[in-house]
Amino acid sequence: MKILYIVLDGAADSPTSPRKTLEEASKPNIDSLGSHAVCGMVYTVKPGVAPQSDYATLSLLGYNPDEYYPGRGPLEAFGAGIEMRRGDIALRANFATVDPGTLRIIDRRVGRSLTSREARELASAVDGMELEDGEGTALFRATIGHRGVLVLRHRSKPLSDAISNTDPAYERRGRFSVALEKYEPFIKLSNPLVEDEAAVLAARMLNEFTLKAVEILDSHPVNLAREKRGLLKANAILSRDAGGLPEEKPPSFQERFGLRGASIVEMVVERGISRYIGLDDIRVEIEGRAREEVYREEAARAVEALETHDLVYVHLKGPDEPGHDGSFEGKIRAVEDIDKHFFAPLLDRLSSAGLEPAFVVTSDHATPWDVGAHSGDPVPLMISHQSIQGSIGKFSETVCLRGRLGTIIGGYRIIPKTLSLLAG
């Protein structure tokens, strides 16, 4: 049995939202899957928790994040292709604009105007930076736009990830960072969060990297050229969410489920999760391309991947961003675009290839347009295959709230539930 596991990023709204995207959007291709399907709701993490995307994605792929989550930094590093060693720490990072004299932050994301090419050039200027009088090293990779990942390594001493962020907009709480409503707009030097030599050393190395990066980047040719064009300089790097390698590597996806899996994802952290659990990473170029073109290629690659894999996981971007913007109409358009440009060609290609896979369709989290942020609400879940008796009709919150699957606590239960259902 082949399985297509399709996640609509942030497509769900809250059951209490006055209007719901999945109910009002015209999505005949998605809804056609409901003719042989069962449905329900799922808390991808747990009730009342507004999931972070990486935590939810790991859960959806069958791994309880409370047991297997290594931290955002390492997942970003895996996705960027950095081979971490025991004792390294990794942090997610982004280029920012600061006053180099006072370290006052002018823009945390360089006005979202930094191209990936510019970011790669700037990253090369700080990658391999020597720290601690040559005893330490910083590895830095640009990923997408203003985003990047930083790995700190010491030659002879282990580093601890128990350190605070240099990004003042996020406060470290346990393994996560939470966005602060108010903060002082200055680079915040890192501090150890425990009384431990490894944490003291890690914080010191992060601070050294952060300050040296401002000196190097402020006068970099890329930034001088941007300044001449009236654009903000990308002259600082803000870091958060430090993490180290887990004590034990998780069982691979094939070991866990007996399935050969592949993923088609866009974000570096999602790619990192795929590599972390041993999914084959199928790349689709997104930079400089229309969203509709990307969807069509993702559909084509998904069908190709089914020829050689048992399960293909596809994480589709689109609805989450207008949800954050509070745009109901934007979420409607995003879901309709997915239906027209991904699901329609996908179903055509499957028919032409004579393939009849099972479908799992859900969201990684709700991003209710009337809230403008991720919420702790459950999201709709549909499992579809020609062998399933019964029809659900429209795929939506209202229908799935009454569904046969009930409410599942934990996205990591979806794959076992699907396999059990398909086994009869």
Swiss-Prot record:
Pfam families: Metalloenzyme, PhosphMutase. It comes from the Archaea. CDD domains: iPGM_like. One of its GO terms (molecular function) is metal ion binding. GO terms for biological process: glycolytic process. It catalyses: (2R)-2-phosphoglycerate = (2R)-3-phosphoglycerate. Its EC number is 5.4.2.12. It is an enzyme of class 5 (isomerase). Pathway: Carbohydrate degradation; glycolysis; pyruvate from D-glyceraldehyde 3-phosphate: step 3/5. Keywords: Glycolysis, Isomerase. Catalyzes the interconversion of 2-phosphoglycerate and 3-phosphoglycerate. NCBIfam families: apgM. Belongs to the BPG-independent phosphoglycerate mutase family. A-PGAM subfamily. PANTHER family: COFACTOR-INDEPENDENT PHOSPHOGLYCERATE MUTASE, METALLOENZYME DOMAIN-CONTAINING PROTEIN. This is 2,3-bisphosphoglycerate-independent phosphoglycerate mutase. It comes from Aeropyrum pernix (strain ATCC 700893 / DSM 11879 / JCM 9820 / NBRC 100138 / K1).
